[in-house]
A protein has these predicted regions:
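Nucleic-acid enzyme cleavage-core boundary/entry regions
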Residues: 1-59, 69-71, 75-165
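Catalytic palm subdomain of template-directed nucleic-acid polymerases
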Residues: 65
């Protein structure tokens, strides 16, 4: 728990979560109350515990690697929560946008090769999780066999994202 705010932020992976937790704890006005990491597909098993938290959770924001697995996990989580009347799950769009900008800053505007070779062939329904403004760009990255990991987010990136949340 980092504040009394009613929003919950979930990262797919541990390293970006730990960096974000550090940034949020140092903030005088964190935009989210709780932060966690889902450990990939494990998030689907643990999300139901949100209902047991003392303070109510208004919204869950999810950010994962911009690859097919990361978006699939988010879309399945959103669907599961909607079907079971749990907190609403939204994309952490400001973080996704920053991941795209970070990849560009690092000289890889289309990301890096995805060794899993998973493309958007898994179904366009998965992309409905993403905000329309970035959906096509991310789909193009996937279709080219590339990905952008959460680990592109730096401490200063996160400070900027959280201050404009």
């Amino acid at each position: 728990r980092v504040s009394d705010a009613a929003d919950f932020l979930i990262f797919e992976n541990a390293a970006p979560y730990m960096l974000a937790r550090k940034v949020l704890r140092a903030s005088s006005n964190p935009p989210v109350g709780r932060i966690a990491y889902g450990s990939g597909h494990q998030v689907g098993k643990s999300i139901e515990y949100i209902a047991l938290l003392e303070a109510p959770v208004r919204n869950v924001f999810y950010v994962g690697d911009l690859d097919m697995r990361g978006i699939y996990i988010a879309a399945k989580l959103q669907s599961h929560c909607a079907a079971n009347d749990l907190a609403r799950v939204h994309p952490a769009t400001v973080l996704h946008e920053q991941m795209l900008a970070s990849a560009n800053r690092l000289g890889a505007p289309r990301g890096w090769p995805d060794q899993s070779r998973r493309t958007s062939a898994a179904g366009d329904w998965v992309f409905q999780f993403l905000e329309p403004a970035i959906r096509d760009e991310i789909k193009t990255i996937f279709d080219s066999g590339h990905r952008i990991p959460e680990e592109t987010l730096t401490e200063s990136d996160l400070i900027g994202c959280f201050s404009s949340w």
